[in-house]
Each structure stands twice: as structure tokens, then as C-alpha cells.
């Protein structure tokens, strides 16, 4: 790896580190973006439909209109992220050209390539990608991802899959930390991950990039749960702006992530939030409805 590429990778991972301990909120217009910023969000994710609406409306979900993203960029001073379809490197080129701060190669959108993910190391802008386990996370990092998030099951309001993916990841990290050098080679082959990244995880006891929770986080308690399980921050999608009082819920989730180990504050911020999003239990989804299975 050349020094130039390595430096770029380090810079991008460093930019993602700056979001650690924060909440990233899905927004569909400038007004929502301003609400998110006022509530204390560390970044916003600009998209035309939140995941719950993508589920309900069906059809092909694509990159958002660049003009909408530009309106959100103009409305706030915090970083603006946007989603592209898995494998759609031209959508990524477009988003980079308009100056988005991070790109999410997202399973929430309809995949453009069912075999290949984007070669993210070619881009200057940092990428975030979803994963269900250590193998998926390290494959995305090897492609150039600067940030990982759980896939969870977006648009459901059910946190169970995000919990499952986080516990899976933490368990695998504990396992590699206890392995001998020769066992690491075998395990790297088993999970189809580069050995240098597996070794780095063994040394660090964690991923070499930040790892956020995403998919089904709908309440302050959900957010605090994911932080206590070891996540570095939280993405909240449909759970805020499909709830009864979005501004209050947004503030509450930000405080919950900051004070995730303080039950008294968590109780305080959980009071009188209005109705949570109705949601849908993951157990009621048919296999074809599950978004987390997209990608490899």
C-alpha cells in the first residue's frame, strides 16, 4: 500500500472518529435537518424517504436528488451524509462531486450490484457501511470504509437485529483477541477477511474504525442499550420524525447517548415523549423483506 493511500485512509478514519459519541439522524428536508442540528445531532443523513417509508412504498430505492441534498447542506453547519446503492460507484461519484461529508453504501437502498461493493479507497470522501458480523465489517474496511455500523433492520423500530449484530461482533472480537497467531490465519480464511485486519483487531480488541449502532433504534433506552453494548454512537432513522414529538425525541436520544450509563437521566429523558413510531417486529418480516441480508 502506498503512503499516499495509507495517509488518505488514516485521514478518512480520523474524520469518522470525530463523530464518536454522537447521534446521526435521518432527515428528508431542510426543516428536519435544522431540528436535528438544534437537538444536538453530530451529523444528518439526507434522504428522500426514511427506511420505514421505503418499506411501505416499495419500488426501487435510489440515491436522493442532489438538489435536495444541497438544500440540507445549506441549512446546517454539521456534516451531511447521503446514501448510495450497494455497488453503485457512479452515485458515489456524484455525491462526492457535490461535497457530501460522508457516503453510506447502504443496504436500505435497492442494490445496484449483487456481487461487488464499491471500491471505496478510490474516493476522497469517507464511507460508512453496514455489517452483521466481523467478516462483513473487515471486508468493507479492506475496500476502504472509514466507519462501520450495524445493519440492524432499518425502518422497523425494532432494535433486536441491531442488538444481535452488535453481540455477534463483540463475541467475535473477544474470540480473536484470545487466538494464537496460527489460529488467526485460519480464522481469517474462515470469515473471508484480510489477515492484516484480523491481526489488528486481535491487538486492539475492537475494530480499527468507529462502529455505530443502526437499524431499529427508536427510543432513548434503545440508544443507551446500544452504547452500553459497546457501540461508538448511534444512527436514528425513522424513529424520530415518524414519532409524535420529533424535536423532543431527538433531544432525548442525544442526551441518552451522552449519559448512557446514568439510569436517572435516562428515566428523565424518556418521560412524555409522545407516541413512538408504530414500527413492525422483525419476527413478522418475511425473508424477502429483510434488508440486512443485502450485501455480503
UniProtKB/Swiss-Prot annotation:
Q: Which residues carry this modification: Phosphoserine?
A: 178, 180, 283
* Binding-site residues for D-ribose 5-phosphate, renumbered to this chain: 26, 155, 216, 237-238
- Encoding gene, per UniProt annotation: snz1
Question: Which reaction(s) does the protein catalyse, per the Swiss-Prot or TrEMBL entry?
Answer: aldehydo-D-ribose 5-phosphate + D-glyceraldehyde 3-phosphate + L-glutamine = pyridoxal 5'-phosphate + L-glutamate + phosphate + 3 H2O + H(+)
- Name-wise, this protein is Probable pyridoxal 5'-phosphate synthase subunit PDX1
- Protein origin, superkingdom: Eukaryota
EC numbers: 4.3.3.6
Note the Gene3D superfamilies from the entry. Answer: Aldolase class I
Q: Which organism is it from?
A: Schizosaccharomyces pombe (strain 972 / ATCC 24843)
Amino acid at each position: 500500500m502506498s503512503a499516499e493511500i495509507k495517509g488518505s485512509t488514516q485521514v478518512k478514519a480520523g474524520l469518522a472518529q470525530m463523530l464518536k459519541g454522537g447521534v446521526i439522524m435521518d432527515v428528508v428536508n431542510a426543516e428536519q435537518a435544522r431540528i436535528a442540528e438544534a437537538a444536538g445531532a453530530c451529523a444528518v443523513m439526507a434522504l428522500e424517504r426514511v427506511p420505514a417509508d421505503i418499506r411501505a412504498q416499495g419500488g426501487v430505492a435510489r440515491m436522493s436528488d442532489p438538489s435536495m441534498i444541497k438544500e440540507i447542506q445549506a441549512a446546517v453547519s454539521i456534516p451531511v451524509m447521503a446514501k448510495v446503492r450497494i455497488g453503485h460507484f457512479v452515485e458515489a461519484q456524484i455525491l462526492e462531486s457535490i461535497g457530501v461529508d460522508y457516503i453510506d453504501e447502504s443496504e436500505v437502498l435497492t442494490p445496484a450490484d449483487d456481487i461487488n461493493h464499491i471500491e471505496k479507497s478510490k474516493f476522497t470522501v469517507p464511507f460508512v457501511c453496514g455489517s452483521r458480523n466481523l467478516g462483513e465489517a473487515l471486508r468493507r474496511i479492506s475496500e476502504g470504509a472509514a466507519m462501520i455500523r450495524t445493519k440492524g433492520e432499518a425502518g422497523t423500530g425494532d432494535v433486536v437485529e441491531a442488538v444481535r449484530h452488535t453481540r455477534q461482533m463483540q463475541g467475535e472480537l473477544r474470540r480473536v483477541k484470545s487466538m494464537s497467531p496460527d489460529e488467526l490465519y485460519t480464522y481469517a480464511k474462515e470469515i473471508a477477511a484480510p489477515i492484516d485486519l484480523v491481526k489488528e483487531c486481535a491487538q486492539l480488541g475492537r475494530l480499527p474504525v468507529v462502529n455505530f449502532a443502526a437499524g431499529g433504534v427508536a427510543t432513548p433506552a434503545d440508544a443507551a442499550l446500544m452504547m452500553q453494548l459497546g457501540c461508538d454512537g448511534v444512527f436514528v432513522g425513522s424513529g424520530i420524525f415518524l414519532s409524535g414529538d420529533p424535536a423532543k425525541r431527538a433531544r432525548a436520544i442525544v442526551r441518552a447517548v451522552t449519559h448512557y450509563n446514568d439510569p436517572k437521566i435516562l428515566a428523565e429523558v424518556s418521560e412524555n415523549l409522545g407516541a413512538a413510531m408504530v414500527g413492525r417486529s422483525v419476527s413478522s418480516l418475511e425473508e424477502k423483506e429483510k434488508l440486512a441480508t443485502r450485501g455480503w
